[in-house]
């Protein structure tokens, strides 16, 4: 058999045995955030209020990440920018904060916000449903807060996060507990999986679990993984 034909056969065989593309774990979970008429101010009122646990504990959460001047961090699912100011302060002008967002309206707001606050270290990134859209080995840490349960394609998204992290980099996941009989009904319906499943998925993506940081949460948890 000629070399060219052998190559074609080999390619065809590989294609036949290629892994199927990951299916959505919860179709439509991000539809509201993709609305071109999304009203950002309403989400600011909803996300940035003392009645939201992660807002009330925002200072402790930011401190627990352990950022230092000159480091680079990606806030995946940056939303209204709740943690961006903390990260910009901690990494200083010598560092970099990537505010990563799927929602076009949040992206627009984050860019205007960084300009108003004179934060040249903040770079806003429009991501996709499968990829955080960051350069390889570009960050020391990736942070997600009440965002992991919005990963519609978690395996693909985690693979892109792992590519973006430098060796030894940290992935911090802050998200809702999902405990039958304890978690509020709306969270049981909204959040697709509990902490144990999140850990399984992140470990399967090639990370190691370093610790769960106790911050006095009632509805959330803080997990630190390493690349």
Give the positions of each predicted feature.
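C-terminal motif of bacterial Sec signal peptides marking the signal peptidase cleavage site
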Residues: 13-15
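Hydrophobic beta-strand segment of the Class I
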Residues: 73, 142-143
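Core SAM-dependent methyltransferase catalytic element
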Residues: 211-227
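A short glycine-rich, Lys/Arg-flanked "PGG" loop and its adjoining helix->strand segment in the class I
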Residues: 155-170
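Class I SAM-dependent methyltransferase SAM/SAH-binding core
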Residues: 74, 78-131
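A short acidic, Gly/Pro-enriched loop at the edge of an enzyme's catalytic core
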Residues: 132-141
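Conserved class I S-adenosyl-L-methionine
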Residues: 172-197
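Class I SAM-dependent transferase core
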Residues: 17-74
């Amino acid at each position: 058999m000629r070399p060219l034909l052998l190559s074609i056969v080999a390619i065809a065989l590989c294609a036949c045995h290629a892994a199927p593309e990951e299916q959505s774990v919860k179709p439509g979970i991000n539809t509201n955030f993709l609305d071109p008429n999304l009203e950002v101010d309403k989400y600011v009122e909803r996300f940035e209020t003392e009645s939201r646990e992660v807002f009330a504990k925002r200072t402790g959460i930011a401190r627990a990440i352990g950022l230092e001047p000159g480091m680079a961090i990606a806030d995946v699912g940056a939303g209204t920018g709740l943690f961006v100011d903390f990260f910009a302060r901690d990494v200083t002008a010598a560092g970099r904060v990537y505010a990563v967002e799927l929602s076009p309206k949040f992206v627009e707001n984050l860019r205007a916000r960084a300009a108003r606050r004179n934060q040249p270290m903040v770079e806003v990134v429009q991501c996709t449903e499968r990829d955080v859209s960051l350069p390889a080995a570009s960050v020391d840490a990736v942070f997600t807060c009440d965002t992991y349960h919005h990963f519609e394609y978690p395996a693909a998204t985690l693979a892109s996060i792992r590519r973006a992290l430098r060796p030894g980099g940290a992935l911090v996941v802050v998200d809702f507990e999902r405990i039958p009989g304890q978690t509020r009904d709306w969270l049981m319906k909204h959040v697709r999986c509990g902490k144990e499943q999140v850990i399984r998925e992140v470990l399967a993506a090639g990370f190691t679990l370093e610790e769960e940081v106790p911050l006095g949460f009632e509805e959330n948890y803080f997990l630190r993984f390493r690349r």
